[in-house]
């Protein structure tokens, strides 16, 4: 079952924000497929002692949030202060949550497309970007569902800033890579996913990775409860296929 870790974010601006991140979304659990260069770039930015910026885009469900969670986990394990701002949940907080984040080691802004056209949020992100440039110490990772110039932002200067750094498209996984990703997730959870069962899932289910991972978790729980190994007949029974 998925569990969560809490990361405390503290800044000199007296902001205290608890971050709850899934503890299984790390670099070790990310199957790169054709994204090896992207993964290397992310890890290089995290290793360096000065600021760095990467913009990562892909359709929803491709693994954008996984990589940001992994980056937060890696630096927080080193004792560094990190900030993760999921803009698809922006109703939970206000733009002022970004105040003081230039003092953190890492800031991750997820799903920036969700605030396109929102003047307050766009200005808050633009101001944070400029403060990070001035500080020269904070790493900034931003994700969106399209390249910066296609975000339909109301603030042209923000679109220009987002277009400055390293920009990567997260490439979708092939079916073979999806099978490897499923088997990796299974191994990390302490069980084996037979190849024939994995190929059956890819053939019969929606191939979006989030759906596949949720199904794998369901099958893991069912297998433990029934004390049965994962076989195609058992999978058919559980999923009613």
From Swiss-Prot:
Gene3D superfamilies given in the database record: 1.10.8.60, P-loop containing nucleotide triphosphate hydrolases (3.40.50.300)
Organism name: Salmonella arizonae (strain ATCC BAA-731 / CDC346-86 / RSK2980)
Annotated Pfam families: Bac_DnaA (PF00308), Hda_lid (PF22688)
GO biological-process terms attached to the record: DNA replication initiation; negative regulation of DNA-templated DNA replication initiation
Keyword annotations: DNA replication, DNA replication inhibitor
Function, as annotated: Mediates the interaction of DNA replication initiator protein DnaA with DNA polymerase subunit beta sliding clamp (dnaN). Stimulates hydrolysis of ATP-DnaA to ADP-DnaA, rendering DnaA inactive for reinitiation, a process called regulatory inhibition of DnaA or RIDA.
Superkingdom to which the source organism belongs: Bacteria
Designated name of the protein: DnaA regulatory inactivator Hda
Family stated for the protein in its record: Belongs to the DnaA family. HdA subfamily.
InterPro entries: Chromosome_initiator_DnaA-like, DnaA_dom, Hda, Hda_Enterobact, Hda_lid, P-loop_NTPase
Subunit text: The active form seems to be an ADP-bound monomer. Forms the RIDA complex (regulatory inactivation of DnaA) of ATP-DnaA, ADP-Hda and the DNA-loaded beta sliding clamp (dnaN).
